[in-house]
Amino acid sequence: MKVTVDAVEVEVEEGTTMLEAARAAGRYVPTLCFDERMAPFGACRVCMVGVEGNDAPLASCTTPCSDGQQIHTDDETARRIATATVELVLSELPAEPEEHTELAEVARALEVGEPRWQGVQHEPKHDARHPYLAFQHELCISCGRCVRACDEVQGAFALTATGRGFHSNVTAGLDSGFTDSTCVTCGACADTCPTDAITEHLLLDLVGDPAKDGGPQ
Amino acid sequence: MSTRFDQSTTTTCGYCGVGCRLEAHRVDGSVRSISPAMDGPANKGHTCVKGRFAHQFARSRDRLTAPLVRENDGFRLASWDEAIGRITEAFNKIKAEHGPDAIAGLASSRGTNEDCYAMQRLMRAAVGTHNIDNCSRVCHSPTSFAMRSSLGLSGATGSFDDFEAADVALLVGVNPTQGHPVVGARIKQAAINGLKLITADPRRIELSDYGELHLPMRPGTNAALLNGLAHVVIRDGMVDSAFVDARTEGFDATAELVEAYTPDAVEGITGIPAADIERAAHLYGEAENACISWGLGVTEHLYGSEVVQLICNLALMTGNIARPGAALLPLRGQNNVQGSSDHAALPDTWTDYRPVTDDAVTSSFEERWGVKLKRERGMTIPEMFDAAVEGSLKAMYIFGEDVAQTDPDTAHVEKALDSLDFLVCQDIFDTETSKHADVILPASSFLEKTGTFTNAERRLQMVTPAADPPGSAKTDLEIICMVSKALGHDMGYESSADVMDEVAEMTPRYAGISHDRIGRTGLQWPVAKDGTDTPILYTERFEREGGLARFAALPYKPPGDAADDEFPLILVTGRRLEHYNAGTMTRRTENLSLLPSDTLEVNPVDAERIGVKAGEEVTVRSRVGEIRLPADVTERIEPGHVFTAFHFPEVRTNLLVGQSADVNTSCPEYKVVAVSVESVRSPGERPQPAELVTA
């Protein structure tokens, strides 16, 4: 079937998502919770697009295309929702995300400036018990990518989403750290994390390692 | 995209045979981080604890950075000229006095295809002997032998993608989540998504927990199990007669042979309940598309090469071959086990396994290199050690292999190394083997060289340097070319691409391979002159004379070692996730803090009988040696069996393994060693033969 993304017509297979169609058409759609290695999740609401005939924007990563659809990645409402979402996410972080992170990239692409809302920010909480993997819990935005990478790419089932609302975060095992969980140190969580909430000590060494200084022990 | 790195290079992992494509990130001249390449065909954006994290070894302070030559009882630093001068002097003297066959070389399954091809050319053209072998001798040589004999070619018939396309997969003697973690993860995901998995292994492996059925056979009884499965497939009418008639030969003899292998009879031999054998045969036989995968639990036996032929039988009689999802997928151990053998680092074959006894092929190499070559095969690794002890082999050039740790019967190997007049080791670290060397040449790791590895899918992939070799160390190819030139045979290669061009020119099945064409996503051989590669083998014909695959009617025969009153337990050895083979690399990384030492897995029933608790030290004694290590009491291992790995030099597991080896390929029988296990604290503690327990 055929769909049009920002006036670019693309031929797609049944079941193709709007995000896949947009990427096939060479159009940029910002995403935070999406990773092509895992099943679409639809949690972050950053990949919103406008669809002709639809009143409200749709999450492109979880919505399948139908024939003849006209999709707009630059839909004004969609962009406004995405930008505000990223702005809210940033407002909870104690510091700006590192430049190389996907979150920083998306914020740049959406031109999110200093957050307008000044609410509570996460307190730094680091875990440096594992020889390679480091937690910086205050950077967790609960996108669920690490948990899904652990389940759907590796199959170690070591990570779990914890807490509710502002206290949502991620933990290894029964809050026992990577080494005492079923973690097999494949690194898929660090690889997919869009904020460095899970990263490697070796990489933190390159920018100074806060996790090593402020571990819980 | 902004980055923290000075440079990122896409290359291919140098650990196991999966062939993950990696991005190696460089800061200040060294590799500081590795992440998965999203377009890697085998890893699809994933890595494991070895490929991703265990790269610190490359920056280790004890890397060899300059040549070393023996002086008195130790070594001293030397220039490249002096080191190579010593080699040429010794080799020329030995050649003059004893002939070229008094010298032997080992290429490395860790090296690139180009390194291995150059190494065999060095031995054949510069030294003048076919005494060249590589470490696939001690792991998958039985696979290579059997697949060539049954199907025609030495390689997997398909790709890892087949696990996702299959309905059923049978894993025999392989533990992918530990030994081949990225494929292990792919199989686990496939199982979660509906692939019906049958695991057959003396240990209950992690994937057994995700499978339909686990078949814990007694070590060394694989042949009985496979003939039993064939029996049920035939008895219950699951044979694909159209396929058998059109594309195979020898079915009737096999059918006749397996008649005796009733599930009850097989239960008697293997210990697997007859009902489970029936169920496994039906799962496999009734699948639309089924794969079989195996590892060293099949090959490292007295009849390993025969069991691989029995695996081929099962696939052939059900027509489960040559389609997506229907494949035979041996999981090759090292990064380049496939390629080192493909590229002629074997005593009996040229590239693409063409025999040295074939006059036309050998003539073509004589012509290409301007030398005279014999038509008789050279020595295999075990034959080399025997010849050294016996006195007819005088010198060895060992590149990238720690035979004194990894080969069986360590005491015999060390005696062989000590018997040599001259030993060259080319490696990145001092090893147990290099302690016996006369000259040690400092080489390069996979992060520092250019070339290709061939993974377990027959896929050649580019290795691209992300850092420079340390100090005055050189790439393996440079060193081999220098030594060859000093011996009077200038190979004339300017780059590793030149080596591959020569391979393509000399090898019809590899005719279209070049570094340019390999590109980012690789080529699966055979590769036609126009560059078309072959993801699935045998879609039209089998690569044997007449184009038919061959059934092999082979009975079960007992393994070379058996438990008795003195040695009542069977030791099985294998890999652990955190470490890699001799541990030369992984023990120099933080992986050591993830797994600092080895243990002996003992079933609770045996532990109680022996009187040992978890964590307590035990002595393990076999007919040839003795080691000590702590016990791990676990139900993963069946009663009557014990398990340990071979990653730690302080344990030296291979002191226990004897000389028993595969009947066709002399691959050692690492998987069946009768042992006795005693608590070191037990009252009847036996005095230790001290010379065998070297720390």
Regions found by a protein language model. Give the residues of each.
Chain B
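Long, contiguous, secondary-structure-rich segments that constitute the structural scaffold
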Residues: 470-472, 476-529, 589-601, 605-695
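N-terminal leader/propeptide and maturation segments of large enzyme subunits in energy/redox metabolism
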Residues: 73, 238-273, 351, 355-363, ...
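Flexible glycine/proline-rich, aromatic-decorated loop/lid segments
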Residues: 203-206, 429-464
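N-terminal export/assembly segments and adjacent metallocofactor-ligating motifs
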Residues: 1-238, 246-250, 254, 265, ...
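Phosphate/diphosphate-binding loops
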Residues: 3-5, 11, 18-21, 419-422, ...
